[in-house]
Amino acid sequence: MSTAVQVDDVMRYRDSRFQTIAAKLLPTQYLVVDDDTALTTTLGSCVAACLRDPVLKIGGMNHFLLPEGQVGDGAPARYGSYAMELLINDMLKRGAHRKRIEAKVFGGANVLKGFTSNPVGTRNAEFVRQYLQAEHIPIIAEDLCGIHPRKVWFFPTTGRVVVQRLPHAHEAEVAAAESAVRARLSKAPVTGGVELFE
């Protein structure tokens, strides 16, 4: 049975490295699957949380740009607080049990040159750790901070994660892509809502 939720037209392709269908998440996207689809993304200062219920073999990934926003600044999906709620709520709606959910978190590199005081990558990493601790969701693996962008593949049915640290040559490309998304989202209207589960 395959009941993948497709959010914002997540691109799917055949991944030749792992010989499976993969879904490539861009900033602000998330996806929950219960099949052999690999969830993949490329991260600079952004963070991806990979959540899984190991009993149901259901899991998902999100990709957020900033920890939290200010009231009324638009495009809430770019913020970790919103992205985490969307991912957790979707898993719960599909039968995941909150007490079984476990997390693996990645990204938060400090790739934006010149931002040495309270860099966004460090803030994103601190946010995801604190958020998951507050939600009582254990982090069973992490690769956060540092200076290198990463490509992440997550296989929700098995829980396997592969992380490839990208060479410095990719830093400018990843940082430019993240900055472009931030600029586009700052002009986007606020849409949708989120239902919070206690």
UniProtKB/Swiss-Prot annotation:
Record GO terms (molecular function) = protein-glutamine glutaminase activity
| Gene3D superfamilies xrefs | 3.30.1330.200
Which Pfam families does the protein's record reference? Answer: CheD
State the InterPro entries in the record.
CheD-like_sf, Chemorcpt_Glu_NH3ase_CheD, Cytotoxic_necrot_fac-like_cat
Under catalytic activity, the entry for this protein gives: L-glutaminyl-[protein] + H2O = L-glutamyl-[protein] + NH4(+)
Highest taxon in the source lineage: Bacteria
Q: Does the keyword Chloroplast apply?
A: no
Q: Which SUPFAM superfamilies match?
A: CNF1/YfiH-like putative cysteine hydrolases
E.C. designation(s): 3.5.1.44
Arranged from A to Z, the UniProt key words for this protein are:
Chemotaxis, Hydrolase
Its BP terms in the Gene Ontology are: chemotaxis
NCBIfam families linked: PRK13487.1 (NF010013)
Q: What does this protein do?
A: Probably deamidates glutamine residues to glutamate on methyl-accepting chemotaxis receptors (MCPs), playing an important role in chemotaxis.
Question: Which family would the database say this protein is a member of?
Answer: Belongs to the CheD family.
What PANTHER family does the record point to? CHEMORECEPTOR GLUTAMINE DEAMIDASE CHED-RELATED
HAMAP family membership: CheD
State the protein's name: Probable chemoreceptor glutamine deamidase CheD
**Species whose genome carries this gene:** Xanthomonas campestris pv. campestris (strain ATCC 33913 / DSM 3586 / NCPPB 528 / LMG 568 / P 25)
- Per the record, the gene is cheD
